[in-house]
Amino acid sequence: MEKDCQDIQQLDSEENDHQLSGDDEHGSHVQDPRIENPHWKGQPLSRPFPQRLCSTFRLSLLALAFNILLLVVICVVSSQSIQLQEEFRTLKETFSNFSSSTLMEFGALDTLGGSTNAILTSWLAQLEEKQQQLKADHSTLLFHLKHFPMDLRTLTCQLAYFQSNGTECCPVNWVEFGGSCYWFSRDGLTWAEADQYCQLENAHLLVINSREEQDFVVKHRSQFHIWIGLTDRDGSWKWVDGTDYRSNYRNWAFTQPDNWQGHEQGGGEDCAEILSDGHWNDNFCQQVNRWVCEKRRNITH
């Protein structure tokens, strides 16, 4: 195509040369203004038609080539865009499926976790209940083990008492200690009434001979004042069984005995009692207190 344009331009040049030579031969008076006046500013001479045609054809070819190239680029970009859209759609579906699957798994784990927590809570509650029950059973067992020797001794003593018709061991509901039997009342009497009650049981009001006996009585008498077999009605303190007062064990509270005279009934304090703290006190004999009877354990062979 370019060669054709060159041929056309060559033919056009030859034709121009021929015309110029013809003009010279005929002595034409037509002069080229550009030759006569080098400063001529008129319109440029128009290019011949074949040259203009060749330039337009080149531009058309360039435009066509550019359009083809642009079309190819558009096709390539469109193809890649479609491929990217397809890949994005596939990726989106994959991510959506993954998200749904993950959410389902999390939901299953949450449900399983809730069930597990409920089961663990139930087990912990049952375990705590069993633990409390075991503690209670353990405390009960310790209590029975602690009192088992005493209970066994009491049962053995009661059995021996019945077998020997009351000639051996302590009577029923009496407690043995140090070779003596003790009975602790559950109601109250005056000192004289309590002393008479003990005599009817072939016993006497409590006579304390040692610190050990004092501790034993305090341990079993609860938190009540109790009468003991000690009185000074005749002006001096004496034990009801004849035990010597001066040489025997004593546990008076501070400032006691004081023979206080302020009772409404009149008279002083001539009868001894054990206070709630274990110390002794002289009190008005008509006061109503609990009491303890004591007698020697009978042993016959």
Curated annotation (Swiss-Prot):
Bridged cysteine pairs (disulfide): C170-C181, C198-C293, C271-C285
Composition bias, Basic and acidic residues: 16-39
Bilayer disposition of the protein: Single-pass type II membrane protein
Region described as Disordered: spans on this chain: 1-43
Positions of modified residues (Phosphoserine): S13
Subcellular localization, as worded in the UniProt entry: Membrane
Main location per the UniProt record: membrane
One annotated Gene Ontology cellular component of this protein: membrane
Gene Ontology MF: a single term: carbohydrate binding
Tissue expression from the record: Expressed exclusively in hepatic parenchymal cells.
Cited PROSITE patterns: C_TYPE_LECTIN_1 (PS00615), C_TYPE_LECTIN_2 (PS50041)
Name of the protein described by the UniProt record: Asialoglycoprotein receptor 2
Originating species: Mus musculus
